[in-house]
Amino acid sequence: MIVIPAIDLKEGKCVRLEQGLMEKDTVFCDNPADQARAWERQGAELLHIVDLDGAFAGEPKNRASIEAIVKAIAIPTQLGGGIRDIPTIEAYLSLGIGRVILGTAAQRNPELVEEACRLFPGRIVVGIDAKDGMVAVQGWAEVTGVTAVDLAKRFEGYGVAAIIYTDIARDGMMQGPNIAATRALAEAISIPVIASGGVSSLKDIENLMTIEASGIAGAITGKAVYTGAINLAEAVALTKRGGA
């Protein structure tokens, strides 16, 4: 299991939202490329990037910042937010993004996931965001009647590289991830699961490591590494040695 720092982009800056609300944002850095370099220096093996404006608009919005990040670092990246079609996926992969995350598009159009996996094997990740176990889309603005587990099962056999599971109620709230829900999802599918939402201490990372065998491949952390609640270098060292 690896620790994956997040860069959430809004109007070209690194921000963090509380529970996905655009009006509840905190700007942590004006230069995303500098921030990416800092996470790389601290031992990050993968960088998670979200185009927040893109997620709400349904089309890419922070391309210049994304390009600057990719050029600034040598470690691989995964990107989500507003990616709804094959040409957009192709454009981002051509830019140097390692893996593309499909969220709203995956829920609304599973055939897109299947086609993307066929065209770009190993480079498509599905993001499943849930509130009380139900899938939320459109930048979390809309909760559907589909459960996270049912949606995840739909992608078995497609060749999806990973599923990022975010518990919206925990995101940006520094309350710890939803271990039970994350484990239940991981055990229900064969696709590796990356936990997201609420990872806010080394203890949270240790707790996720206890369920690593169920299929947990990583933990995304955002606010905690910006505020210093998690020292990224320490978190990376913890996962490398397999626990405390």
UniProtKB/Swiss-Prot annotation:
The keyword Amino-acid biosynthesis applies. GO terms for cellular component: cytoplasm. It comes from the Bacteria. GO terms for biological process: L-histidine biosynthetic process; L-tryptophan biosynthetic process. InterPro entries: Aldolase_TIM, His_biosynth, HisA_bact_arch, Isoase_HisA-like, Isoase_HisA-like_bact, RibuloseP-bd_barrel. Pathway: Amino-acid biosynthesis; L-histidine biosynthesis; L-histidine from 5-phospho-alpha-D-ribose 1-diphosphate: step 4/9. The active site is at D8 (proton acceptor), D129 (proton donor). It is an enzyme of class 5 (isomerase). Signal peptide: none annotated. The keyword GTP-binding does not apply. Belongs to the HisA/HisF family. HAMAP family: HisA (MF_01014). This is 1-(5-phosphoribosyl)-5-[(5-phosphoribosylamino)methylideneamino] imidazole-4-carboxamide isomerase. It comes from Geobacter metallireducens (strain ATCC 53774 / DSM 7210 / GS-15).
